[in-house]
Amino acid sequence: MAAMTVHLDVVSAEQSLFSGRVESIQVTGSEGELGVNAGHAPLLTALKPGMVRLVKQFGEEEFIYIAGGTLEVQPNLVTVLADTAVRGEDLDEQAAEAAKRDAEAQMAKGASAELDYNQAAVQLAEAIAQLRIIQQLRKK
């Protein structure tokens, strides 16, 4: 028997990164990790910078980095509207490492304004999310 699937669209302002049937989706919502399978209750939630892990039909996995956005779950359609989205294999590890170091340095020197600190914290979260995806791809 075939696994139950749902249609998923992952889009950003720049492009559509994925459109097709998936068995499951995992994202980082505003309240923590969230998994969506076929038959999930309708939902609308904010997404934090992180990984979209999707399991396509027949078990193939794909990883996409998003820098925040919105998740909408309808009975037969799941949509990820990302602020920015990049396929996992297109991420630049050296750039992510450099961004992580810069954000940590900015936070360590006690940013002069709270806004600077918050911006550095967001940059750090984005860099860590990118590095997590790169590590996941290495495990495959």
Swiss-Prot record:
It is a peripheral membrane protein. It is found in: Cell inner membrane. The keyword Cell membrane applies. Keywords: ATP synthesis, Cell inner membrane, Cell membrane, CF(1), Hydrogen ion transport, Ion transport, Membrane, Transport. GO terms for molecular function: ATP binding; proton-transporting ATP synthase activity, rotational mechanism. It holds the Pfam family ATP-synt_DE. InterPro entries: ATP_F1_dsu/esu_C_sf, ATP_synth_F1_dsu/esu, ATP_synth_F1_dsu/esu_N, ATP_synth_F1_esu_C, ATPsynth_dsu/esu_N. GO terms for cellular component: plasma membrane; proton-transporting ATP synthase complex. It comes from the Bacteria. Produces ATP from ADP in the presence of a proton gradient across the membrane. NCBIfam families: ATP_synt_epsi (TIGR01216), PRK00571.1-4 (NF001847). Belongs to the ATPase epsilon chain family. F-type ATPases have 2 components, CF(1) - the catalytic core - and CF(0) - the membrane proton channel. CF(1) has five subunits: alpha(3), beta(3), gamma(1), delta(1), epsilon(1). CF(0) has three main subunits: a, b and c. This is ATP synthase epsilon chain. The lineage of its organism: Bacteria, Pseudomonadati, Pseudomonadota, Gammaproteobacteria, Alteromonadales. The gene is atpC.
